[in-house]
Amino acid sequence: MCGIWALFGSDDCLSVQCLSAMKIAHRGPDAFRFENVNGYTNCCFGFHRLAVVDPLFGMQPIRVRKYPYLWLCYNGEIYNHKALQQRFEFEYQTNVDGEIILHLYDKGGIEKTICMLDGVFAFILLDTANKKVFLGRDTYGVRPLFKALTEDGFLAVCSEAKGLVSLKHSTTPFLKVEPFLPGHYEVLDLKPNGKVASVEMVKYHHCTDEPLHAIYDSVEKLFPGFEIETVKNNLRILFNNAIKKRLMTDRRIGCLLSGGLDSSLVAASLLKQLKEAQVPYALQTFAIGMEDSPDLLAARKVANYIGSEHHEVLFNSEEGIQSLDEVIFSLETYDITTVRASVGMYLISKYIRKNTDSVVIFSGEGSDELTQGYIYFHKAPSPEKAEEESERLLKELYLFDVLRADRTTAAHGLELRVPFLDHRFSSYYLSLPPEMRIPKDGIEKHLLRETFEDSNLLPKEILWRPKEAFSDGITSVKNSWFKILQDFVEHQVDDAMMSEASQKFPFNTPQTKEGYYYRQIFEHHYPGRADWLTHYWMPKWINATDPSARTLTHYKSTAKA
């Protein structure tokens, strides 16, 4: 996880403007650099580095002798960079995975380049020879990117919105900052005065499409057809490959472990592959919760079963509530379920950074959206409607779960890796017949559970453990995080405030006291930026008024009441 930042055509003092880049210093605690672009006194790059690959030569912007006119600032991991280097016989100057972007661009242009990348990324590529600027982001938006572009051609780009909101520009006192769309790249012309003009925004990949880079993958051949045993075999192959390719790092690997299906599968497969790779350390797994919470108990079972070096982080309701302000500042959103679920992830990331040497952290993010794991999928009117909803959730990941996962870990200088959002694994899963992917026998993610039933990766009670929302599983049924928050906000927001909510917050008006409380905090940090969240995350088909799984009639808990 790194932080990237760039300005083109600034009409204010760059030394003053660069101060805004320090607001994302948490993303790269190992080193930082600011560099002016040759020949353009009002253009510069900023970079905060978390050294994960090639600690000696990995500073950015990346420039190599062969292409002196190319400047690259990127945040991400390109898992197939070595395969592409060997395939096209590129001569590398560094061991940095991102260098492949320069070679591919020189060989085939921006579209072929971005379609060949197997990984997660957000980048700014400058070509001074052809006077072009390119912005790009991975399919699911696992790595964040924000931009501000004024009518007169001032462009500002950053990993997080907080690095842009305080920038000054003569013609636009209030810069419109917006997220760069996942699965897209943008082409901009660079003018002699350093300003830019947008040429085109291109959608280069959809989650259901098999990626172009698949033809160069080293994964073993998949079997054709949709017979259940064939599908299960292919899913195991692709999942194991998704884990394996993400072992690329020079830093210690750890894994978040809630004791739910997704994180448990990741942890078990990860530990197995680390042993095969003969890494010189034990896998550290991390669980958080209040004492005797369902997640802590389940995670302990998994850790004992797989033999990881397990860490349990206990927190109380007061610590959780006190963290809300810094959590919302880090997230840059006021979405209710995102904030709720982020508290535990924020606190455990803080623990990992302070108490361990694990830096690259695996997690199970993306599985619920991909495999129809949310409880409300039981209410889907048809397999086809469930399929549509799954694709919608994946398309909006960058606003919700992926945002949460990135900001809570990056806030503490950690890098998150999410194998369930692997291009090959996800596109194959989405290609399966809709009826194979829906809940079965009252159990969500039935196909995924069935796939690993005979693998001995996990205890049966974990493999078939019902869905538990992370924000609820870290507490208990009797005193859930949901209930704790409702009791707290009842004393912070009164009925009079709620009656005037639509006047105070006309856009995305909060409908609950909890939502009002979060919105107040957000507006304090980011006044006038409510449109960063287009809509609240809510379950479908059930007329819910709150996103908590605790409020659903289908909810089942493995905890003792």
UniProtKB/Swiss-Prot annotation:
Active-site annotation: 2 (for gatase activity)
Intrachain S-S bonds: none
Phosphothreonine found at: 545
GO cellular component annotations of the record: cytosol
The keyword Glycoprotein is annotated on this UniProt entry: no
Modified residues (Phosphoserine): 557
Modified residues (N6-acetyllysine): 385
Pathway: Amino-acid biosynthesis; L-asparagine biosynthesis; L-asparagine from L-aspartate (L-Gln route): step 1/1
GO molecular function, a single term: identical protein binding
EC numbers: 6.3.5.4
EC main group: ligase
Name the UniProt record assigns to this protein: Asparagine synthetase [glutamine-hydrolyzing]
Species in which this protein is naturally found: Rattus norvegicus (Rat)
Recorded name of the encoding gene: Asns
